[in-house]
A protein has these predicted regions:
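Extracytoplasmic
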Residues: 12-46, 67
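Hydrophobic/aromatic and small-residue hotspots that mark the transmembrane alpha-helices
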Residues: 35, 63-71, 121-124, 133
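Juxtamembrane helix-start elements in MFS-like secondary transporters
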Residues: 45-53
Length: 141
């Protein structure tokens, strides 16, 4: 493979990882964006609404280490694909939530999207030499 071809592949992987991270980040904030509507529709208390908003944030933070480890073991492409599928499904079914419990469950899965940063860092680093990783990672996240 030529250097030019390898650079093109690396750039394409960077774009795909960045777009995936952006979409995951949007899904990660989905619950908080719609929290006022959920509160009104389901009659949630302030405390319940706060818990609903906190679940994805906390899970995203806690899941970064395991997601990073999975990325090291199985590769970013597989882990990102599985995560993206789970998050997309959770985001698609959020409107079907009929109870606070269902929303918490969906928020849990959306919280996994917060760990996408750790996946992308390992994935992007793999495609770039050390001299270019700072720039690539700066563009990624």
């Amino acid at each position: 493979m030529t250097v030019h071809a390898a650079d093109a592949i690396a750039r394409r992987q960077l774009v795909l990882a960045t777009v995936s991270f952006g979409l995951c980040f949007a899904a990660w904030g989905l619950i908080s964006a719609f929290a006022p509507a959920f509160r009104e529709e389901l009659g949630l208390s302030g405390q319940a609404t706060s818990l609903l908003i906190a679940v994805p944030v906390l899970l995203g933070s806690l899941a970064r280490l395991p997601m990073g480890m999975l990325t090291d073991r199985y590769g970013g492409r597989l882990v990102f694909t599985v995560l993206f599928g789970a998050v997309a499904l959770a985001a698609a079914i959020v409107p079907l939530a009929q109870s606070f419990g269902m929303l918490i469950a969906f928020a849990f899965f959306l919280g996994l999207a917060g760990a996408s940063f750790a996946i992308g860092v390992g994935f992007v680093s793999h495609w770039f030499p050390a001299a270019q990783q700072g720039t690539a990672l700066g563009l990624y996240g």
